[in-house]
């Protein structure tokens, strides 16, 4: 029975028809409330609107949680690279010039498959490949960020075939993870970001950096590890909120045991090679404190932290048997970049995580971009010397060493006398 309060404050029965309507509305309201409660069960992961014209993501079998105390069944080989942009469909002036040079000078096509094939040898032997997807993926009208006549506007939207090209670039047994927690995933707007996520997932690429929940990755060994991406923005897990970083990583460790963290933060460009324990500013924006971020992630139980965002190589540092590489630089960036030393140098980092979740060994594979979208192994191994020297400068006690083969080692601590100020 539906009742209403009469102006005389006495309860009166409503006419039957109106009562039925009001009751139905009450039921709808209750159902809506129940739906709202269901949606609130995952407070840290707001529901995403389905993207227009984007394929539905593939359904995967649920991964099995790994208790914290359990060991990995087999060593895990992780290879990670920095920023990757596989082509563009924005039809800007720089793109037309770059396409012409690629075809005339290098005999290459700017199509995503052609670009992505250059990544394959750099990730050989990886059980898990991790890259930063620097830009949106989609089609349709171009975003308004750049004018068609632009030669230096940094907006990236890659063709829809990019997602499948990225997956095909790696061995079928390699689990591929793409990070979208970065400052260019919104280059086609919020809807474009949703389309990017959907296309990657449909292609079989795991996506991280979408929200505060780690991305579980099931491995052929039967193990499941998790990857969690951060950027300095409220629409992604915010790397500047260190208490939240600790909370999200700790939650992932409790559930999955082995957690790999990727961070897109720090100032950008040739003057941003140094890593200091301080908040970094770029274009008047706070880009976070990479050192404090890594500390928070390791204190929460992360095994490996991979950095990108500065577009240059930075130092690496040991935290006991765990490892952070603060920036791997540009890997394969098809865009209006000025590619000269040091922005043309990058590296793929490969680390072996043993059964007790320690980094047993690690190495760098040096790369060089000789033209936008044209990548080759760096025979001069410039990346090795850069990372080694930057690590000595920024972390003289805990920084990595890099030998002539790219293998990462530990520094011999200076004696107390050597550390005494003179």
How should each PLM-predicted stretch be described?
Residues 19-29:
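Bacterial N-terminal signal peptides
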Residues 1-14:
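N-terminal secretory signal peptides that target proteins for export/translocation
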